Amino acid sequence: MAEPRRVAFISLSPVRRREADFAGAEREPPRLEPQPYREPARAEPAPRADAQPPARDKPLPQREVSRAEPPMALQREPPRPEPPPPPLPLQTPPPRESASRAEPPPRPPKETVRLELVLKDPTDESCVEFSYPELLLCGEQRKKLVHTEDPFTDEHKERQEVEMLAKKFEMKYGGKARKHRKDRLQDLIDIGFGYDETDPFIDNSEAYDELVPASLTTKYGGFYINTGTLQFRQASDTEEDDFTDNQKHKPPKVPKIKEDDIEVKKRKRKEEGEKEKKPRKKVPKQLGVVALNSHKSEKKKKRYKDSLSLAAMIRKFQKEKDALKKESTPKVPVTPSSSSLPKPPCVTTALGDDIPDLGLNSADPDLPIFVSTNEHELFQEAENALEMLDDFDFDRLLDATSDGSPLSESGGENGNTTHPTFPSQVVPKVVPTLPEGLPVLLEKRIEDLRVAAKLFDEEGRKKFFTQDMNNILLDIELQLQELGPVIRSGVYSHLEAFVPCNKETLVKRLKKLHLNVQDDRLREPLQKLKLAVSNVMPEQLFKYQEDCQARSQAKCAKLQADEEREKNGSDDDDDEKPGKRVIGPRKKFHWDDTIRTLLCNLVEIKLGCYELEPNKSQSAEDYLKSFMETEVKPLWPKGWMQARMLFKESRSVHNHLTSAPAKKKVIPASKPKVKECSPKKDPKAPASVVASGGGPSTSSSTSIVASASSSSAPAQETICLDDSLDEDLSFPSASLDLVSEALAVINNGNKGPSVGSRLNVPTTKPRPGLREEKLASIMSKLPLATPKKLDSTQTAHSSSLIAGHTGPVPKKPQDLAHTGISSGLIAGSSIQNPKVSLEPLPARLLQQGLQRSSQIHASSSSQTHVSSSQAQAAASSHALGTSEAQDASSLTQVTKVHQHSAVQQNYVSPLQATISKSQTNPVVKLSNNPQLSCSSQLLKTSDKPLMYRLPLSTPSPGNGSQGPHPLVSRTAPSTTTSSNYLAKAMVSQISTQGFKSPFSMAASPKLAASPKPATSPKPLPSPKPSVSPKPSLSAKPSISTKQISKSNPAPKPAVCPSSSSPNTLVAQSSHSTSNNPVHKQPSGMNISRQSPTLNLLPSNRTSGLPTTKTLQAPSKLTNSSSTGTAGKNSLSGIPMNVPASRGSNLNSSGANRTSLSGGTGSGTQGATKPLSTPHRPTSASGSSVVTASVQSTAGASLLANASPLTLMTSPLSVTNQTVTPFGMLGGLVPVTMPFQFPLELLGFGTDTAGVTATSGSTSAALHHSLTQNLLKSLQPGAQHAAALPHSPLPAHLQQAFNDGGQSKGDTKLPRKPQ
C-alpha cells in the first residue's frame, strides 16, 4: 500500500450487469454466459476481473465504440494487470449497489463502467473515501462530454442537467414534507395549547373569548389578538378554500378531510382552545352561551356597532337566555347554520377526545363549542360569574359591543362570558355601603359620581373617565387622603360599583391623578423660576461677553508679544508657554435671593410629590437630582447651570432628607485619618508631646516630658513630617537658645538653671534623685502598662528614659538633671512625639537636636575645653535630637558629679571623654541618646525597666562611687549606653529591631548622617522596616526619622543632621527595645554595669571619632567586667577597636558616618578595618556596625535588651548582659551611629577634672572632627565618604553597609526574631 493502487470498479449493479451480459449473450451466445458474470459481481470482484476479459473481447469494443469513451478505455486497461487489488474497493461499494438495485430496474440497463481510484495510506486524521453514486455521475458526465459532438444537443443536455439539479435539491430539501401530517390533528384543535398563562410576561387580565359561529369567520381569517374591534364576515366556500389552503401549509394532513369540515373544525378548535384557556383564568367562564344566536349574528353585528345602554344590554341578554332555553330544553339544540355542515365521525371523536369537558352527545360540530352538556350548569356558571364580578365592566362591555362583535355581549371584563340568568342579576347588583361618618362634602362628591355614572350608562359613551369624571374622582381622593385607611378602603369598594374597573385599578388611577395634579402644581413655580432666570440672564450674558472680549484681546496681545519674543530669539517666555492655553471665562451664574427662593419653593413642592410616590425606588437625593437635571437645569442657557449647583442652592429645603448620608460618609473617612496619624491611641499625641513632651508616656516621664516639651515644644509643634525640612529652619533660634543656655550652664558650672528655666520640669532640679526615682518607677510601670501602646508609650518611655537617664545623672548635679532632663525630654519628646504623633514629633526633636548640636558645635566648639568634651557631649546630645537642655544638663551634671566624687569623676571622665568624642563623633552622640531612649524603652517594654534603673544604681555604687555619684555615673554610662543602645535599638527598630541590629543601626545612622543630603530617604526605609516589626512604634519612628532627616539638612549640616538622626535612632531603638522587653531588661542590668563602661568609653572616645564605637565597645566591656575600673581598662583597651568599628560604620553608613568620623580619621580607620570584618559577618552591611556601636555603648545595659534589636549580635542576648556588649562590640564595633547622641549626658557623673584631663584633648579633637564630620554628613553621601578618614574601610564592607542601610528593613526583619 506504500504506493497508490489503481483498482477497477464496475459501476453497474449485478442486475444491470446481468442484463448487459444477456445482451452480450444474444450477440455471442457461445461465449457469454450469465452465470460467470453474476457470481463475480455478487461475490468476488477478482474472479470477475479474470472472467470478464475473455467475455468482453468482442462485446466491450462494441459498447465502447457506441459510448465513444476513450478515457474510459484507458481506465479499463490498468486494472487488468492488477486483478488482485480490486477486492478492497469493491467490497465497500456492494452495499451501495444493493441499495441502488431497487431503483434501476425500470431504467434501461447502464453500460459497464470502470473506475480508476487511487488509494492512499490512511492517517490518524483522515482516510480515503469514495461515493459510488458520485463516481457514477462523474462517469456519465464524461460520457456526455465525449458524445457531445452535435451542437444541437446542447439544449437537451442543459435541460437534463437542470432537471437533475432540481431533483437533487428537491430530494435534499423538499422531501418528506407530507410525512408529518398524520399526527397533527390534535394540533388544530387548540392552537394555543401549551401557552403558559402563569408567565408573568403575559397579561391576560383584560382578555376574554369571543365565540365565533361556524357561519362566520374573522375578517381576515385565523387567530386574532384582542386589540381593537374584532371584525367578522360571512364564511364562504371560496374563502374556506383559501383558508384551508393557507392552513394546509401548517398541517399537511388537511387534504384527507373535506374542506368544509376542516374549516369548521379549525374554527371550532380555535374557539375551543380559547374556551379551554378561559377556565384557567381567575373567574369561571360560561361556555358557548352566544353560539345559539349565531344565525342572528349579521343583524346583531350591525346593532352592536352603536353604543348600547345598560338597559339594552340587559334586554338583549334576557332574549338570548330565553332563546337558549327554548332551543336547549329537549336536547342540546344545534345551530341552523352549523347543522347544515356535515361532520365526519372522525372529527367528532377527535374533538370529543380533545375536549372531554364538553361532553359531546351529538356529532354536530358546533355543540361542543357553544353549549355545555347541561343547561342548568350553563346558567349556574353565568350566575356565578356575575356574582364574582361585583359589577360589570360596562366600559369594556359597551366598547366590545360597539365594536360590532356579535358575541361581545357575553364578554365580561375578565374574559368571562357573562350571560345573566335573570335580569335582576345584573340590575340589582350588590353595592357595598359607604362607611359612616364621612364628611358631608365627600358624600356629596360620591353622589355626584353616582349620577355621572348613571348618565354614562343611560346615554352610552365612548369614554368613561372624562375630565369631569376625573375631577370628581380627584376631589374624592384628596378628601380621602385625610381619612383613615379603613374608611378609604370602604369608599373605594363603594365606588367600584360605579366605575368600569376594579378597586385596585381605581386606586392606582386616583394616585396617578393626584401625582398629575402635583406635577401641575410644579408648572407655576417652574414658570416663575424660568421668568426670573430669563430676566437676570441678559445682564450676566452681557458681562460674560465682555469678559470673553477682554480675554480674547489679552490673548491676542499675548500672542503678539510671544511672536515678537520668538522673532527676537528670546527664551524668557519658556516659563509662560504653559499659560498660552487660555481658557475662556467661566459661565458662572450669580444667584440672588429671588431666584434662590423660587428654586427652594419648587424643590419643596417636588419633595411633596416624592412623599406621595407609592414605591420610592429612588432616594430623595437621587429623586431631586434627576428632577433638577431634567426639569430645572434647562431653564438656564446651556452651560450656565449644573444640577449640583441647584442641589446646593436648595439645600436649606431638602437638607433634612439628603444630609444624613453625607454625614455618615464623612465620619468614617475622618476616623481612618486619625488612625493613620496615630495608630496607637495617639491622635492627640503630637499635641500632648508638645505639651508634655511624652504624650503616651507622660505618666512615667511626665516631669521630664514637661521639661522637654517646654524646651522643644515649639519645634515639636511646628515640625511635621511634611514640613520637617522647613521646620529645621524655622526653629533654629530655639535650638540656639537651648544650646547657648546649655553652654552657659556648662561653662559656669551651674546646674543648668537656664536649662531648667527652659524646662518646666527643671524647676525640680534640686531633687534630681527624686526625679530619677520617679522616672524609674514611672518607667517600670509604663513598660508594663504601655506594651500595647508601643508606639506612643514606648516613644514616651524612650523620651522619659532619655530624660530619666539625664535625670539620674542629675541626681548628683541637679542642674545636670534639669538640663539633662530638658535635653533628654527634648530628645525624648521628639522620640515620644514620634511615637505619639507617629512621626512629626521625633522629626521635630531631631531637627531641634540637629540645629542645637550644629549651633553648639559651631558656636561652642572652642568652648568645650575639658568641659568642652562635656559641652560637646551636650551639643552632640542636642544634635542627636535629645535637646540642648539635656546636653547642658548632662554637662552640668557631669561637672557636678565630678566635683562630688573623684571616683565618679574618674568614671565620668572616660564617659565625658567619650561624650566629647561622641559630640565630635556623631556616632558617639547618637549612641548616647539612643541609650537613653533604649533605657526608657527597656523600662517600658520589660518588667525589668526598674531593674534596668536599679542595675544602674547598683552598678554605680559598685563602681565605687557614692550612691549619688554612682547614680550619676551610672546615669551617665547608662545614658551613654542608652544612647548607643538607642541608636542601635533605633536602627534595629528601623530594621525591625530584631534580626540585624547592626544593619538597623547602620540604617539609623544613615538616617542621621545622610538626612542632610539624600540619606533622609534612606532613614525612612529603615524606619519602615522597623514599622513592620513594630507596626505602631516602628511606623511612627520611621516617620519621625524621615522628618528628622529632612529637618537635619535644614539645620546646620554638620551637627544638626547627626543629632537629629540620633534622636530618631533613639526613638526607634527605644521602640525596638520595647519590642524585645526581655532583652531590654538585661540591657538595663548591663547599663547599670555600664556606668564604668561609659567611663571607659570616654577614654576610647578620647581617641577621636572611634570614641563613639569605643564607647559602645567599652560599654560592652564594662558590662562584662561589671566594675568601673575594669570597665575603664576595657575601655582603654577597646578604644582602637571601637574607633575602627566606628570608622567602618561611618564608611558603611555613607556620608553620615563619614562626617561623624571625620575628626578621628586615622584612628577610626584603623579601628574600622578590624570592626568591619566582624561587622560584615554580623550584619553584612554598615548598618550592623552602627548597631554594634549602639549596642556596645548600650551593650551592658541597653545592648543586652537591644540584642534582639541588634540583629547582629547574638552576644547581646538578654542572658549574657556582660558578654553581650563584648560580643556586640566585636561583631558590631563597626557600628557607627550616624546620629551623635550626647555622650556627655551619659557621663554626667564623671569628674570635671577627670573628664577634662581624659577627654580634654580628645573632646577638642572630637568636637572639631565632629563638626567637620557632621558638616560633611550633611553634604551629599559621596562627599561624606570622601571626607571620612574611614574610607579605608573595605570597599565591600562600605558597600554592604550602604546596601544594608537601604535594605535594612528587609534584612533586619528576618533577624529581629533572633
UniProtKB/Swiss-Prot annotation:
Residue numbers carrying Phosphoserine: S13, S236, S297, S402, S405, S408, S570, S1091
Question: Which portions of the sequence form the region Disordered?
Answer: 1-113, 236-288, 322-345, 400-424, 559-584, 657-709, 785-818, 849-893, 948-975, 1003-1185, 1288-1314
- Where composition is biased (Pro residues), the residues are 81-96, 1014-1028
Ranges of biased composition (kind: Low complexity): 330-341, 685-709, 849-879, 1003-1013, 1029-1040
Pfam families reported in the protein's UniProt record: HUN, UBN_AB
Q: Which GO CC annotations does the UniProt entry carry?
A: nucleoplasm
Q: Where is the composition biased (Polar residues)?
A: 415-424, 792-801, 883-893, 1057-1132, 1142-1153
Residues with N6-acetyllysine modification: K1036, K1116
Q: Report the residues modified as Phosphothreonine.
A: T229, T238
Q: Which residues fall in a compositionally biased region of kind Basic and acidic residues?
A: 16-31, 55-67, 560-570, 673-684, 1305-1314
Q: Where is this cross-link: Glycyl lysine isopeptide (Lys-Gly) (interchain with G-Cter in SUMO2)?
A: K258
Q: Which InterPro entries match?
A: HRD, UBN_middle_dom
Which UniProt keywords are given for this protein, alphabetically ordered?
Answer: Acetylation, Isopeptide bond, Phosphoprotein, Ubl conjugation
What family is this protein classified in? Belongs to the ubinuclein family.
The identity of this protein, by name, is: Ubinuclein-2
Q: Which organism is it from?
A: Mus musculus (Mouse)
**What high-level taxonomic lineage is stated for the organism?**
Eukaryota, Metazoa, Chordata, Craniata, Vertebrata
